[in-house]
């Protein structure tokens, strides 16, 4: 199965890498390709276009994939494309994701 990374996912991926996040692009989890995966923190990031919210079938398929990832211990963050178009908003989005990652790792390793 071939997968093509969207421009929006690439922009967020590079913004996270710039912040030192050990992100992996298009990671296969045995079921599907994750746009951006951070296995160390057990977090998956999906960068979603409009069709993910306007199409019932797509939205339900996304929810099911989120559920099955959750059963494996992974939390999925869904980022709408609108948060990566503008550089200012992209940077703010990446900063918030770094905050989520730090909190996740702190909880995993009992640092709080």
Model-identified regions with their sequence ranges:
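Nucleic-acid endo/exonuclease domains
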Residues: 1-112
């Amino acid at each position: 199965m071939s997968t093509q990374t969207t421009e929006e996912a690439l922009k967020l991926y590079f913004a996270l890498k710039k912040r030192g996040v050990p992100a992996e692009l298009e990671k296969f989890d045995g079921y599907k390709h994750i746009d951006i995966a951070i296995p160390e923190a057990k977090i998956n990031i999906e960068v979603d276009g409009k069709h993910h919210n306007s199409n019932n079938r797509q939205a339900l398929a996304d929810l099911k994939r989120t559920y099955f990832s959750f059963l494996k211990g992974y939390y999925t963050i869904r980022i709408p494309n609108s948060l990566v178009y503008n550089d200012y908003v992209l940077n703010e989005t990446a900063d918030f994701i770094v905050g989520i990652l730090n909190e996740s790792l702190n909880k995993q390793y009992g640092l709080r």
